[in-house]
């Protein structure tokens, strides 16, 4: 099938935001996406799904591309982010290890179970046809599922896409500012105190994304608002979600509130965020060296220099925060002068009271956030006119 013709049909239908991890079976479609659309190369397949989900919240129709060997990496966000929040994505997964066809031994088992994994996740799927007319009809069918807030995947056989040469890519290098070398004080603030400071800087152009566990629950108790999103499950994906949203909504301030256990799970996304460097995003790490919501088991965060890592990955500003006053000053500076920022605050494991879970359902959180973003977009258009 002619890759450019298929890609142009996708673009006509509104699919112009792509993210994923390469596969030789999909390389020509990936090349088209890089040449003609917005493409975000993800650190892993799960991050790609989360990035696409953030782009969807920002009004895009996202496409996720991956090899089937990485489909298992995408299971967590598909079942605990996209399913409960009812966030649709259009996926293309290659069929390496297709039974009856020669392939490398590492693809043998996944080739046998690829479609079974999709079935078990209740993801509708279809083998992508190599006939353009048929493929166009398949895209329209996929659209019907996506319009009902369901993900849809195409399983792609070898040789489906004809050659699409990759145009020369720019390789920007981001020069980060030197990290502040100050260390945290002995008396660490509580998470609730930090969240109150963060929430105090929220305005009508701010979106707050809180990682799974106690962070989201405590933010909910401080103030439940339509421009808050509380992650449930999909641990480690909050920064990926923030990247997708920041890239698709550059006129909004995206505040990502992460935890040490969460960030440790998907540290590769630091490099992806640093490369695409959305200036309207601040990534705040509240680090208590523990998995607090599961009993306080220790993480290895005390052995990791997150600030140096973020700086090395291309964050424009990376800094240690010594106190709540530092956090307040950091947010004020970022609000006044944007730039991709990573801020690390050591917090205690003490909690005032066990926080209750949000009463609002995840898909309701998504729907009201989408309405908030749409209102903000319309207000901006009205101001310009």
Language-model-detected regions and their locations in the chain:
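A contiguous pocket-lining binding segment that forms or flanks enzyme active sites
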Residues: 282-314, 320
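DG-centered beta-turn motif at the end of beta-strands
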Residues: 63-69, 252-263, 268-270
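Short acidic/polar active-site loop segments enriched in Thr and Asp
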Residues: 16, 61, 279, 316, ...
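Residue-level marker for buried hydrophobic side chains located in beta-strands
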Residues: 208, 254-257, 284
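Active-site regions of oxyanion-processing enzymes, predominantly non-cytosolic
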Residues: 151-156, 339-345
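A short, acidic, amphipathic alpha-helical segment used as a generic capping/interface helix at domain edges
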Residues: 140, 323-336
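Thiamine diphosphate
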Residues: 1-243, 247-248, 252, 321-324, ...
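A short alpha/beta connector and helix-capping loop motif
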Residues: 79, 87-90, 266-287
